[in-house]
Amino acid sequence: MAASARGLRTLQSAHSSTTVPRLQLAVSRCYATTTSPDPPITNSSNSSNSTPTPKQRITAFKDKLNAGPSFSDFVSGGGGGASNDRVPLDPAEAYALKTALVGPPGRKKQIIRLPSWLKTPIPDTPNYRRIKSDLRGLNLHTVCEEARCPNISDCWGGSSKSAATATIMLMGDTCTRGCRFCSVKTSRTPPPLDPHEPENTAEALSRWGLGYVVMTSVDRDDLADGGARHVAETVRKVKQKAPGILLECLTGDYAGDLEMVALVATSGLDVFAHNVETVEALTPFVRDRRATFQQSLRVLKAAKEARPELITKTSIMLGLGETETQLWETLRALRTVDVDVVTFGQYMRPTKRHMAVHEYVRPGVFDLWKERALEMGFLYCASGPLVRSSYKAGEAFIENVLKKRRGEGADGGDGGNSTRREDVERLVAGGVVR
């Protein structure tokens, strides 16, 4: 083996000692690839006397485009015919143009482009950065970020301190349930509760100086009480630090434990919110299997029975494939448990792992369902493509209702037990409601 190795090294050194002249090799390659003789050398004086080739005007291409067919010629299907032969697109055909084919070759699929009424600006304002800094400093979470809410630029980027708001998410950023529409992280064993969260939440809300605040929470089926005592303690801490603040809590169903529902409802909050999310027929396909439509109705009913003067609220997503008949049945079911406020919003797919959007509902349809809800006796209805259950679109109205009730109680009135019709009539007379 040693002798063969020495022989191999000797052979390698012999090859390396043979050098190939680089210039000669380059010249040989040049001759090998040249098929025509060298161009003649021209005198510089002759080239200077030659007439330069005229350059085409830069605008020549633009002139040709302007003289050609316009964009309307393409979308209207018109070619070279007369203009009176071109038929404008109807709404269905125009809407069909908002589709696109995406994906690799052979596996392309058609998607619907996001309608213009669902596009929002990128958040970047001083108030947005201030709220984000406060949340990070106090180790707090918001549903605005975790659920990828499209209204974050509006809610966090208010022009003034009182105009900006955020929805605090209690009990961490990890949920024990996996609804197909929600982008919040899920785990069977989420981190333990932060014992300082109630105090930190109260500190943040008192620092912002807001008049109306929404708190929500993840579902914690790993806890015996579902986190109800933690939520109730947070409400009490907030009311101690900011007694004048109006507080709305968007809660889970606490696995159907109505005692825990009553505990939260009587903790001092002003609005009890729990979302049914969709119609009953679609609930098994949209929500986690542990959440049912009838259980949500029982939660809303129990909260109202625990405090009859408490405003109860729920939210419904459109665009999941629900029918008009199913929506009517849902509203009737909500009225049977005396729900005061309902909101309608467009479902928007957060990631490819979540269920697809069945339909982008037009703004006019949202306006129609708002009228129908008010006719059925709901105290208020916020309805629109970008409306969310904790969006501030309906908070101004509810805030005025609560302030009216507080004022009546202080003046020796009915102590906050005014009826739904009286509240609405007073606010209409005052110009608050249109």
UniProtKB/Swiss-Prot annotation:
Xref: InterPro entries: Aldolase_TIM, Elp3/MiaA/NifB-like_rSAM, LIAS_N, Lipoyl_synth, rSAM
Bias (Low complexity): 34-54
Residues given in the record as [4Fe-4S] cluster 1 binding sites: C144, C149, C155, S390
Keywords from the UniProt entry: 4Fe-4S, Iron, Iron-sulfur, Metal-binding, Mitochondrion, S-adenosyl-L-methionine, Transferase, Transit peptide
Cofactor: binding details: Binds 2 [4Fe-4S] clusters per subunit. One cluster is coordinated with 3 cysteines and an exchangeable S-adenosyl-L-methionine.
Transit peptide as recorded in UniProt: 1-31
E.C. number(s) listed in UniProt: 2.8.1.8
Record bears the keyword Ligase: no
Reaction(s) catalysed by this chain's protein: [[Fe-S] cluster scaffold protein carrying a second [4Fe-4S](2+) cluster] + N(6)-octanoyl-L-lysyl-[protein] + 2 oxidized [2Fe-2S]-[ferredoxin] + 2 S-adenosyl-L-methionine + 4 H(+) = [[Fe-S] cluster scaffold protein] + N(6)-[(R)-dihydrolipoyl]-L-lysyl-[protein] + 4 Fe(3+) + 2 hydrogen sulfide + 2 5'-deoxyadenosine + 2 L-methionine + 2 reduced [2Fe-2S]-[ferredoxin]
Region named Disordered: 34-55
Positions annotated to bind [4Fe-4S] cluster 2: C175, C179, C182
Known cofactor(s): [4Fe-4S] cluster
CDD domains reported in the protein's UniProt record: Radical_SAM
Radical SAM core domain residues: 158-379
Subcellular locations according to the entry: Mitochondrion
Chain segments annotated as transmembrane: none
Main location: mitochondrion
Disulfide bonds: none
Cross-referenced SMART domains: Elp3
Pathway: Protein modification; protein lipoylation via endogenous pathway; protein N(6)-(lipoyl)lysine from octanoyl-[acyl-carrier-protein]: step 2/2
Annotated family: Belongs to the radical SAM superfamily. Lipoyl synthase family.
Protein name, UniProt field: Lipoyl synthase, mitochondrial
Phylogenetic placement of the source organism: Eukaryota, Fungi, Dikarya, Ascomycota, Pezizomycotina
